[in-house]
Amino acid sequence: MDENQTAALFADLESSNKPTIRAAVDKLVKLTADAPTLADELSRLLDDSRGKHRWPAAYILAHLPHPSQRVFNVLINALDHPDADIRWAVMLLLVRLAKTDGEIVRLLFELRETGTPTQRRMALYCIRDLNLTDTASLQALLDSLRDDDPTVRVAAVTSLKGRLGIDSGGRKMLYDIFVNDPDLRVRNAAAVTLAQLGAPSGEFLAALKLAEASEHAQLRKAATAALSIIQKRRSAPAGG
């Protein structure tokens, strides 16, 4: 590929059209693997004061062996990007890289506490998708149930759905959220998550029955869904 074609790809990184950006990123990922000069140019773009080039450059460089800390820092910052598609693309990349790089896992745990609400939420989704089974990651999810931002609490609640080892204390936290959280979105999510954990307590079942008669349509819907999940689990064949 000649210099004009390469320059055109770099120009496409500034496009307002996401498919155009994505096509340029994909082509540059392939080209940069065999062209150190392109990697150097992309590294310079990490310091782009306007910010438009930064996340695409970091995304491309992250596909090379041994990405720098600067690359990871830009990607972490991109988890706060206003465009959800970009956030999720970066999230998927970070999850893939974190499976073989413990430093990224550490950065995600740190971001869960120190980031913006959007970053904290995306960090939780990353932790969820890593399918971690250790007590530290479980505690991180439980700690985020107390986050000030309701969207972060929703992310924490939904990320607990597939986790094993949630003890009575964790279940009590979810129950309290279902009954008392000031945001209905969080309560709705807690109802379904608790139901999916199995072995519902009597007080949870009673609270679901009350919620079925709520004046809030979404809460009624969540309670009905939770009760349906519980019923299906009870009627499922043993060991099935």
List where the protein language model places each region.
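Structural detector for internal amphipathic alpha-helices that build alpha-solenoid repeat scaffolds
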Residues: 1, 19-34, 52-67, 77, ...
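Amphipathic alpha-helical scaffolding segments comprising HEAT/armadillo-like alpha-solenoid repeats
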Residues: 1-12, 33-47, 66-80, 99-112, ...
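Positively charged, hydrophobic/aromatic-enriched amphipathic segments
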Residues: 11, 17-24, 43-44
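Short inter-helical turns and helix N-cap capping residues of alpha-solenoid HEAT/ARM repeat scaffolds
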Residues: 16-18, 49-50, 82-83, 115-116, ...
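Long hydrophobic alpha-helical segments typical of transmembrane helices together
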Residues: 207, 213-223
